[in-house]
A protein has these predicted regions:
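Short alpha-helical segments enriched in small residues
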Residues: 23-190
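An accessory alpha-helical subdomain
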Residues: 1-30
Length: 190
């Protein structure tokens, strides 16, 4: 068992001789269990690639609005060939969680997209993220302590948190659940 840390991801590897593959595969569920909500993806398919594949398989389109991540989500998803209808980068502005959710509903309707994903600006280590689907809107205010990291690392962390919400929705999981070391401060559903 080994690991490689490259914030925001810690890569876990279980390696050994091919003759012991069955033993390693038997151990892997325990590793997955210990990782819990911190598990982002398994194998070599990145989270943006996984999201893009699932969106294509389910014939869903997505539109994005980014403040803090400044277009990083659009870059990641377009690089993975996601069915991205539109994306916008807005200047930082103070928003309540209800406002983020409301504007996301409007954005989905305006762009005729199946899904809309918004990342607001960061205030006091907290960020609003909203996902609007055909069934409704799930918005969360998350607290994470990442101020010691460079701006681009904090942006990658927030992009990963937003994509995790999408992955959870696509997999039928609780969208507003805790994300490991990230604390859910507030939720809002429309």
């Amino acid at each position: 068992m080994g690991y490689r840390s490259s914030t925001p991801i810690i890569e876990l590897k279980l390696t050994g001789p091919a003759s012991r593959r069955a033993e390693m595969e038997a151990i892997w569920p325990k590793v997955r269990e210990v990782a819990g909500d911190s598990l982002i993806f398994e194998g070599t398919e990145t989270l943006p690639a996984q999201i893009a594949r699932c969106l294509r398989e389910q014939q869903l389109s997505i539109t994005l609005s980014e403040q803090f991540t400044a277009g990083l989500l659009a870059l990641q998803l377009s690089g993975a060939d996601a069915p991205l209808l539109a994306s916008e980068v807005l200047p930082a502005q103070v928003e309540t969680l209800a406002q983020t959710a409301h504007w996301n509903v409007d954005r989905r309707s305006r762009h005729l997209a199946d899904l809309a994903l918004s990342i607001a600006s960061v205030e006091d280590d907290e960020i609003n993220i909203a996902l609007t689907t055909p069934q409704g809107t799930h918005a969360v205010r998350l607290r994470f302590n990442a101020s010691r990291y460079a701006l681009h690392i904090r942006q990658e962390i927030c992009a990963m948190m937003a994509l995790t919400l999408v992955r959870r929705w696509l997999n039928g999981q609780d969208v507003t659940a805790s994300q490991g070391w990230v604390q859910v401060v507030e939720t809002h559903t429309v």
